[in-house]
Amino acid sequence: MKSVITTVISAADAAGRFPTASDLESVQGNIQRASARLEAAEKLAGNYEAVVKEAGDACFAKYAYLKNAGEAGDSQEKINKCYRDVDHYMRLINYCLVVGGTGPVDEWGIAGAREVYRTLNLPTASYVAAFAFARNRLCCPRDMSAQAGVEYAAYLDYVINALS
């Protein structure tokens, strides 16, 4: 699984060298942010059902036409699949917070997602809206500390940009 630490080690090994001072600074920064990332992961895990529901609701509020006949959410089964996808990505974001890198999202979420969604006639903009809502709804310190919020929002932004 890709993280800052595994990326630094892999790059140094591929070049047949020890990690540079710059490499080690990158690792140190990652380690220093670990506490905030773990706080964000804990808060997300403790409230993920509400986060997923609110994000999914925001998606269908913004793109109400998706519930029309012939659209991606024209049955309860399809609507449930949308919420399932949002849940899946939120779990991957949680894993990224724990790992300290984008590996989980890259490996289990992003690779090929846009192509799959296009094939299934699922507009990625609706997922982007769901994750943007989750990001914009975040309130520090109500939900988590400011630094934890920065870490959480960064992974939401990563998913938003990847699906855009």
UniProtKB/Swiss-Prot annotation:
InterPro entries: Globin-like_sf, Phycobilisome_asu/bsu, Phycobilisome_asu/bsu_sf. GO terms for biological process: photosynthesis. CDD domains: PE_alpha (cd14769). (2R,3E)-phycoerythrobilin 2 binds at C139. It is a peripheral membrane protein. Keywords: Antenna complex, Bile pigment, Chloroplast, Chromophore, Electron transport, Membrane, Photosynthesis, Phycobilisome, Plastid, Thylakoid, Transport. The keyword Calcium does not apply. GO terms for cellular component: chloroplast thylakoid membrane; phycobilisome. It is found in: Plastid, Chloroplast thylakoid membrane. Contains two covalently linked bilin chromophores. (2R,3E)-phycoerythrobilin 1 binds at C82. Heteromer of 6 alpha, 6 beta and one gamma chain. PANTHER family: C-PHYCOCYANIN ALPHA SUBUNIT, PHYCOBILISOME 32.1 KDA LINKER POLYPEPTIDE, PHYCOCYANIN-ASSOCIATED, ROD 2-RELATED. Belongs to the phycobiliprotein family. Light-harvesting photosynthetic bile pigment-protein from the phycobiliprotein complex. This is B-phycoerythrin alpha chain. The gene is cpeA.
